[in-house]
Amino acid sequence: MCIRDRKAPKTASTDDAKTREIVQTLLKDLETSKETGCKDLTKKFDKYEGDIIVSKERIEEINKSIDQKTKDDVKFAHDRVRKFAEAQLKNYGNDFEIELSKGLYAGQKLVPVNTAGCYIPGGRFAHIASAVMSVTTAKVAGVKNIIACSPPKPNVGAHPTIIYTANLCGADVITVSYTHLTLPTTCTV
């Protein structure tokens, strides 16, 4: 038997000066143009021109369009993850303090963050498990402001099943974009 050493074709380099310059320019533009710049880049790269923040009306419309089998499956997964997260919090979340030496104390106190950003991949497939795992656990932990973010499909926006799942699991805001610059200005991060 003969084993050949084959090399994959070279891909575009990300370690050259021109690439770094392009990325730095994009990031600088995003810092100054904020949501407008994000919308422009989403239009350019993702071929999506819709709203960045998914409205309550759109969520309700999507909820009605999802078939019952999918809804049942998502609810089943959500319930399982929620039950486990609650048990984990109950059994792991015990605060404690010990005196290591006279006057020197160490301990643990679990405090949820105010805001959690939950990225939900949405390339060729709707990765609803990412929505279930990240949004549900943040909700159980007591996070007050949960923002779910998923990339858009051309001319569609985020996958409807991702939007349905993020909403069911307790996301407070659902955005369609790749960047954190699309967080609503009302968020306290």
Residue ranges and their predicted role:
Residues 165-178:
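A glycine-rich helix N-cap at a beta->alpha junction
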Residues 34, 142, 180-184:
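Alpha-helical hinge/cap motifs
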Residues 1-5, 179-185:
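Conserved small/polar residues in nucleotide/adenosyl-binding loops
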